[in-house]
Structures are given as structure tokens and as C-alpha cells.
UniProtKB/Swiss-Prot annotation:
One GO MF term attached to the UniProt entry: structural constituent of ribosome
GO BP of this protein: translation
Annotated organism of origin: Oceanobacillus iheyensis (strain DSM 14371 / CIP 107618 / JCM 11309 / KCTC 3954 / HTE831)
Protein name: Large ribosomal subunit protein bL9
Ligase among keywords: no
Domain of life: Bacteria
């Protein structure tokens, strides 16, 4: 029997896969537990429509990430911190602070986990910080740390 998997089934298939499985296994386990549905022509068309919609959504997310990357390249996030001699900060600037400042100053909401700061910023001046906006799109933000 040909079935469309609705959920991941360990060792068998992932969600959205179409596979041929034994009739008894399909009727007694997969269909009863709503793990799969029979692969009728109507269900196959619905699956194709879902895949197309998911592809369009993915494409839109990628385009949005590219647009955001271009906007971020033009701006510099301004942060203030107390510092001592030689421009060293008391404390440090973290990705969370950069994310909050970006939201407050420019209205761009970027999750702090997407800001790829190897180690916190501990000096005054300009720093370029890489940002992962999408699995296929990376950009960078200029961060200016000024003395308070």
C-alpha cells in the first residue's frame, strides 16, 4: 500500500515522504495512529500544494533576509559603555545588547543567537559583527562603542 507520511516515523520515513509499505503495517499501525494517510490522487495533490507553498514561503524568507542584509550594511549600531585607560571597557558588550540596540535604534528585530559574536566586545571603537540572517544568507553589522 502506498502511503503519505504525516509525521516522522523512526527508521521508516520522514514527514511528507511517499512510500510503499505492507498493507497490514499501513492499516493496523500507520493509519490508526495518524502517522500516515493513503496516497490517493487527492491526497497527492494536497501534498504537492503544501510543498509548493512551503517552497514559496522559504523563497520569501530568503528574499527578506537579503533585503535586511542590505539595510544592515548601511547602518552602525551605537552603544555606550564605561571605559578605563587605553579604551578598555569595564565589562563587555554582548550579542544581547547589540540585538536590543538594533531593535531600539532602527526597528530591526534580530534574535541574539543569530549574531555571531565569537567573544564579547571589550574595547571602544568600531567593530564589524557577523550575522546569520538565514541558512543561506549572512551579513554584518557595524557596532560603534562610545565612552559613557
Amino acid at each position: 500500500m502506498k502511503v503519505i507520511f504525516l509525521k516522522d516515523v523512526k527508521g521508516k520515513a520522514k514527514k511528507g515522504d511517499v512510500k510503499n509499505v505492507p498493507d497490514g503495517y499501513a492499516r493496523n499501525y500507520l493509519l490508526k495512529n495518524n502517522l500516515a494517510e493513503e496516497a490517493t490522487s487527492g491526497n497527492m495533490k494536497a501534498l504537492e500544494a503544501k510543498k509548493q507553498k512551503a517552497d514559496q514561503l522559504e523563497q520569501k524568507e530568503k528574499e527578506d533576509a537579503i533585503n535586511l542584509k542590505d539595510k544592515l550594511a548601511e547602518i552602525a549600531v551605537e552603544l555606550e559603555a564605561k571605559s578605563g585607560d587605553n579604551g578598555r571597557l569595564f565589562g563587555s558588550i554582548t550579542s544581547k545588547q547589540i540585538s536590543e540596540a538594533l531593535q531600539k535604534q532602527f526597528g530591526h528585530k534580530i534574535d541574539k543567537r543569530k549574531i555571531e559574536l565569537d567573544e564579547p566586545i571589550r574595547a571602544l571603537g568600531y567593530t564589524t559583527v557577523p550575522v546569520k540572517l538565514h541558512p543561506e544568507v549572512s551579513g554584518s553589522i557595524k557596532v560603534h562603542v562610545a565612552e559613557k
